[in-house]
Structure formats: structure tokens, C-alpha cells
Amino acid sequence: SIDAEGLFLRKRHLSVPDHLTWRSFKQGMLVCHQAFYARLDIARDIPYDLQYRHSADVDWCIRVMKETERKHLPLVRVPGVVADFMDGGNTTQNHRASLKERFTVMRRHYGLLTTLTMHVWFIVRSFFR
């Protein structure tokens, strides 16, 4: 992330795996939406679900990756930094609501048991950052 003057603050705590799939997002949002590029034909067919005020980006990325898998298309990792962003956006400002909504998104895509298990891991992982 960067500050208001564009100076580097820190890297994201999550990193993109070499082989990304929609299942990868069980670990958290591994690619920020600012750096997530989708083919236009797929992106046009998958609008943001506006019932989510804070986690529509997570849901959209997962649905795009599911569609990519369904069409047997590759997901390509671009090496290097493709987007810088400032801390303090919508998710940060609405942290509690964002966490609840992200749980709902994960439950929708991965099921309740997996989502609960991963959230226990998120809590444990937070102590080691």
C-alpha cells in the first residue's frame, strides 16, 4: 500500500500463489480487485452483485474465476506489481460490516464448514503477522 503522497508503506500480507483458482480465495483475497484483470467477454457477463456493499469485489473475482474454469481458460499471473492502493478504503472504514459480508460471500462459494474452518485459521494467522 501507499500513502497519500504515493510513497510505499508495505506489501500486502497475502501473496498470489503460482497457480490461482477460485478455490484459492478460501485463504483470503489473494489478489486485490485493483490488480485483477478479467477478459472483457467474461467481465461483461458477470456484474458486481450489489447486495454486497463491502465485499462485492471478492464475490466478483470468485465468480469470474469459476467462469474461467468452466470455460477451460487459463488464469495467468502477471509478475510484479500492477497496482498500488492506499489504505483506508471502504473495507477499512467499514471493517466489521466488511468481515460479516465476506463471511457470507465465502459461505456462498465454499460452504459453511470450510468457511468456519478458514476463519479459525485467519484468527490464528493474525497472531503471526
Predicted regions and their residues:
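Conserved donor NDP-sugar-binding/catalytic core segment of glycosyltransferases
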Residues: 1-10
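C-terminal, non-catalytic tails of nucleotide-sugar-dependent glycosyltransferases
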Residues: 7, 70-74, 97-129
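Conserved nucleotide-sugar donor-binding catalytic segment
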Residues: 9-98, 105
